[in-house]
């Protein structure tokens, strides 16, 4: 994880000092904490320069450069799904905009009378693909089934509900926080769904 960052696609000159360190810590924390709820591809957080040796054959060794220690994670290799999944639990941003105009949230009808930033009953999972020009397209249920297959899609839907609810409970108890919107990337291995990339890191 590097210190590079951007806002709405515009790079921040010089990045954010130590951002990569905190991104690695956040990801490793939530990957380890939620692995019982939903399996993910996380294997280890490399905090010391010799931590990679545990993955090498006997007699082999590798010394990680000091500037990379605390910024690297080891992941299980899985096949990524060509879609970004987003969980929306509260009426903010584009979710509120669509609801205030149509009564829907990403095409899903909602009860009337909800207020801005209010909890969405049940929360919503949506998926997007991004083309070469950076344009995003929301996938329909039929397109999702074509991408993942029906069994894997059901596993993903079940996983996001368990994961989102577990994280919400943990944050309410420990920090009085809520998660209004969460991006998830899924992959698969032997027809089983795994959380990939990051969990609860600020993008």
Q: Which residues are covered by each model-predicted region?
A:
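Short, active-site-adjacent segments that bind or coordinate small-molecule cofactors and metal centers
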Residues: 76-78, 177-182, 187-189
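Short histidine-centered catalytic/ligand-binding loop motif
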Residues: 10-22, 128-159
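Catalytic activation segment of kinase domains across protein kinase-like and atypical kinase folds
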Residues: 184-203
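Active-site loop/lid in soluble adenylation, ligation, and acyl-transfer enzymes
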Residues: 1-130
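A long amphipathic alpha-helix within ATP-dependent nucleotide-binding catalytic cores
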Residues: 147-180
């Amino acid at each position: 994880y590097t210190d590079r960052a951007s806002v709405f696609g515009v790079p921040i000159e010089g990045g954010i000092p130590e951002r990569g360190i905190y991104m690695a810590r956040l990801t490793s924390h939530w990957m380890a904490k939620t692995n019982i709820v939903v399996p993910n591809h996380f294997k280890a957080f490399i905090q010391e320069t010799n931590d990679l040796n545990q993955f090498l054959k006997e007699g082999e060794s590798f010394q990680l450069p000091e500037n990379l220690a605390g910024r690297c994670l080891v992941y299980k290799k899985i096949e990524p799904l060509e879609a970004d999944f987003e969980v929306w639990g509260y009426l903010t941003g584009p979710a509120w905009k669509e609801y205030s105009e149509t009564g829907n949230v990403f095409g899903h009808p909602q009860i009337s009378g909800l207020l801005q930033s209010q909890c969405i009953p049940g929360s919503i999972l949506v998926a997007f693909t991004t083309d070469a020009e950076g344009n995003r397209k929301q996938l329909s249920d039929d397109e999702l089934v074509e991408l993942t297959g029906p069994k894997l899609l059901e596993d993903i839907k079940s996983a996001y509900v368990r994961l989102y609810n577990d994280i919400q409970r943990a944050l309410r108890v420990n920090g009085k926080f809520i998660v209004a919107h969460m991006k998830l990337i899924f992959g698969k291995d032997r027809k089983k769904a795994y959380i990939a990339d990051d969990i609860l890191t600020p993008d």
